[in-house]
């Protein structure tokens, strides 16, 4: 991959982040500049002065980071060493060649730089160290016609290639018709960017649609998930009322981050379902969405933070959530130490396996962009450490799921092996704590 970066004349700071084989003939790689760093302000610090917690929540903490943002937004495609303004991230696509080699085919520039939380200038001076945003692991801003695009997965499910759906003679102007023919969700046109503009504004995700919904931040139509005409004052008011800003209280955050579903579907959907390919919420017996909280919030929308959790962008700490340490079990060997609160709590437990041969819970009932589920989660050696994710009441974990912690920490692009049981998770001799 270093050779590929050299050939493409990318800055020497570029590094390989992720890669994936696509069939036998394609190799897709994601590269980013190590100079691009990000820092967060979630509005919980004492000096926030009651400002809108969603304004300027994300900022780039180096000049190169800001250049990457400005360069990608300006549409500059010059990646030569002479132009240091461009530090955008790229999807690189390679074609298989004889003698087990890969030949560069094309690159796709991401709308915003791929960034991840790192220690850097300004990080040590922030007063909200250890807050929710410091747990951000990955930020992948997607664009159409990449293996990471939601519609790519939906199109494949329905037997159509992504480029066939998005592009072709007259298809851009007849997007609604094409979308309907391929039985895709109510997604925006082919030019819309599918990532959040995290550095400003407020964004929402509609629960019954597979694509994020954005509040338009300027006069442009493309690039906000919905055309401006579709985001009227009525929808904005409804979204703001249904998905209020979260940050004033940790307990409120805890109550809404894992959207409560009716029935027995109480797994960590926001953590386990790390794909925007399929984002259909389970319905209850009456046919409603079955979403929301006891105060009737988050019935139709998720705000920026919750939407990012659903998309798998923000990966919570394996020990804490929203900074409310007292509510979370930090002792892997103490399975009875759950939240004293009567409200459901998200709990994390370390578990060292004696065996891992349970049927895999089918979180995804169709192909997803980078997840391939085995029939059984064989292949993990005895003693492999897992993390149990589930809701906790009193002395048990309901609908516990097992996930290798190094997979969890890397986020949705790497989450390949999930073990679980279809019934209530019971601790017994076979399931031993570390």
From Swiss-Prot:
Chain spans, region Disordered: 168-193, 215-267
Sequence ranges of Basic and acidic residues compositional bias: 218-229
Composition bias type Polar residues, residue spans: 170-184, 248-267
Homology family: Belongs to the MgpC family.
Descriptive protein name: Putative MgpC-like protein MPN_149
